[in-house]
Amino acid sequence: MPEPAKSAPAPKKGSKKAVTKTPKKDGKKRRKSRKESYAIYVYKVMKQVHPDTGISSKAMGIMNSFVNDIFERIAGEASRLAHYNKRSTITSREIQTAVRLLLPGELAKHAVSEGTKAVTKYTSAK
């Protein structure tokens, strides 16, 4: 009885690398579409805070979901605030108010001070 033909090992589930497929008729290779994530930014911040610490891909996925969730909440709240005040533009003021409304106590204070610092750094660099 003939043995079944062994195929190449399948790439890991959730792998972020671009996988090249078989060439098409015009000779170009197809690539897997890129997934946008906050992984590199989470990693950079983690290394600033804890240089000797690593992070698993599962934990990175959780952190990515967390950042996306917080982003959507802040953007949604800022959008509502702009709408209530009959404004068509979300400014840093709406973002700051949204952060104050969404985050509890001391966390909101730290977030606002870090945000203000980032905006100041950005405007002075221009």
UniProtKB/Swiss-Prot annotation:
Glycans are attached at residue 113. InterPro entries: Histone-fold, Histone_H2A/H2B/H3, Histone_H2B, HISTONE_H2B_site. It holds the Pfam family Histone. Its main location: nucleus. Keywords: Acetylation, Chromosome, DNA-binding, Glycoprotein, Isopeptide bond, Nucleosome core, Nucleus, Phosphoprotein, Ubl conjugation. It is found in: Nucleus; Chromosome. The modification N6-acetyllysine is found at residues 6, 13, 16, 21. Monoubiquitination of Lys-121 by BRE1 gives a specific tag for epigenetic transcriptional activation and is also prerequisite for histone H3 'Lys-4' and 'Lys-79' methylation. Phosphorylated on Ser-15 during developmentally programmed apoptosis; which may facilitate apoptotic chromatin condensation. There is a cross-link at residue 121 (Glycyl lysine isopeptide (Lys-Gly) (interchain with G-Cter in ubiquitin)). Residues 1-35 are annotated as: Disordered. Gene3D superfamilies: Histone, subunit A. Residues 1-12 have a biased composition (Low complexity). One of its GO terms (molecular function) is DNA binding. CDD domains: HFD_H2B (cd22910). GO terms for cellular component: nucleosome; nucleus. The modification Phosphoserine is found at residue 15. The nucleosome is a histone octamer containing two molecules each of H2A, H2B, H3 and H4 assembled in one H3-H4 heterotetramer and two H2A-H2B heterodimers. The octamer wraps approximately 147 bp of DNA. Core component of nucleosome. Nucleosomes wrap and compact DNA into chromatin, limiting DNA accessibility to the cellular machineries which require DNA as a template. Histones thereby play a central role in transcription regulation, DNA repair, DNA replication and chromosomal stability. DNA accessibility is regulated via a complex set of post-translational modifications of histones, also called histone code, and nucleosome remodeling. Belongs to the histone H2B family. This is Histone H2B 1.2. It comes from Xenopus laevis.
